[in-house]
């Protein structure tokens, strides 16, 4: 069943799964089902593993809810309580609509790149577990420099162009009859994102009203019923939620019209009809064919709507570029139309003129082609080249002569064992070479790999790699000449202290319990103390400068 730390958000009883009665539990991070009379879950799905949910159409005999997983599997739940089946199913559906977006998988390129790096490099994976999983440093700090190094790879560094918004994305919203003289719209997350990017006023209204004043279903129902969606209606209801959005769009359209399109290669004002007078000259009197007001023109509303829709679709891409590149502190307007006015600034104007009069094929290409160094497996470069030692090679004849000489000496050899070593000298030598003898004072350091178990050696290696990574971040902050480095060096000091408490001290206690020498970690402690002394010296000099 649910653990004591899990928060149960909703419990629905009389829910069947494969013709077996049970109860459905919605918790903070997963949905689970337990058979009736059992104290354990037989079905449990994390919200991050759920792709979408589906419900049975209205009028069906069975009130069901289906969960579709990312792996392609499905799970069906049948709400068997006749009196409250629809109400309970809708309650589960509405709660899942709020929970699933929070746990939506982020299957982007950056995450795939991180997974690939961890799978290909076991040392990096172990370092990730020692530092990030144990919460010594954050994941952002761990990946700060590593992703930048891999960005130089030609396969991953190419900037992928984002998919724009289709001009007919609303045409994909095909209403279906629900059998009760009503319409049902099926909205996907892509369509909702396109609506928000095209109409920032709707996104602002969504943030204001959902879920504070109404549910998401009510919001989109009122959106498709509103005058804002049906622009060809003549009158706007007084209680229309989107009346303000239409006014904001009208204001933005007037601003765009007043600014015009400042394209030096195209003059749109010259396309206006200019009738000739009787004397074959341009008449200054306005034509009677265009004397009708906009309100009298039945096509003006739909033309204005098309123009505004096209402008907003184009502006959505510009707003995304400014959000990625622009951190210049310029305020943006509420209606989101501020990006539309910057399309043809002088820099863009010069670029368009240069594009029209220059040809790349005729220009001189003076750029030097360089090849970026890409180390696929860095552990292959940890060891330097082995120096070549001068060796004297013997020929086959030299080897034969040496063998014959040794053979002749061995034939005439007579052993004299009593004159080799006396018994007292042999006894004193054995005593000096025994553990605790005069010649065995430094023997522990030479045989540490034989005295320490393999698991302790492996853990000690992991500690060295982890502390080396932390110290690399620490020493890279010097010289501390920016506010960012000042903040980072103080933060890295706290990370080193956290590593010492959570990793180094438990390891010392472990080897102490096994009656091993605590000198195993003396070098790590020395490196940490050197870093602390460096930070203390920098802080002292900083205080002296301030005083």
UniProtKB/Swiss-Prot annotation:
Sites where N6-acetyllysine occurs are at: 239
Sequence ranges assigned to domain BSD in this UniProt record: 99-154, 179-231
InterPro entries on file:
BSD_dom (IPR005607), BSD_dom_sf (IPR035925), PH-like_dom_sf (IPR011993), Tfb1/GTF2H1 (IPR027079), TFIIH_BTF_p62_N (IPR013876)
Is the Signal keyword given for this protein? no
Q: Where is this region: Disordered?
A: 319-342
User: Which compartments is it annotated to reside in?
Assistant: Nucleus
Q: Which GO terms describe its biological process?
A: cellular response to leukemia inhibitory factor; nucleotide-excision repair; transcription by RNA polymerase II
Q: What keywords tag this UniProt record?
A: Acetylation, DNA damage, DNA repair, Nucleus, Phosphoprotein, Repeat, Transcription, Transcription regulation
Q: Which SMART domains match?
A: BSD
User: What is a single cellular component term in the Gene Ontology annotation?
Assistant: transcription factor TFIIH core complex
Q: Where is the composition biased (Polar residues)?
A: 321-340
Chief place of localization: nucleus
Which pairs are disulfide-linked? none
Q: Which Pfam family, any one, appears in the UniProt record?
A: BSD
Q: Which Gene3D superfamilies match?
A: 6.10.140.1200, BSD domain, Pleckstrin-homology domain (PH domain)/Phosphotyrosine-binding domain (PTB)
Function statement: Component of the general transcription and DNA repair factor IIH (TFIIH) core complex, which is involved in general and transcription-coupled nucleotide excision repair (NER) of damaged DNA and, when complexed to CAK, in RNA transcription by RNA polymerase II. In NER, TFIIH acts by opening DNA around the lesion to allow the excision of the damaged oligonucleotide and its replacement by a new DNA fragment. In transcription, TFIIH has an essential role in transcription initiation.
Quaternary structure note: Component of the 7-subunit TFIIH core complex composed of XPB/ERCC3, XPD/ERCC2, GTF2H1, GTF2H2, GTF2H3, GTF2H4 and GTF2H5, which is active in NER. The core complex associates with the 3-subunit CDK-activating kinase (CAK) module composed of CCNH/cyclin H, CDK7 and MNAT1 to form the 10-subunit holoenzyme (holo-TFIIH) active in transcription. Interacts with PUF60.
**Family of the protein in this entry:** Belongs to the TFB1 family.
Q: What is this protein called?
A: General transcription factor IIH subunit 1
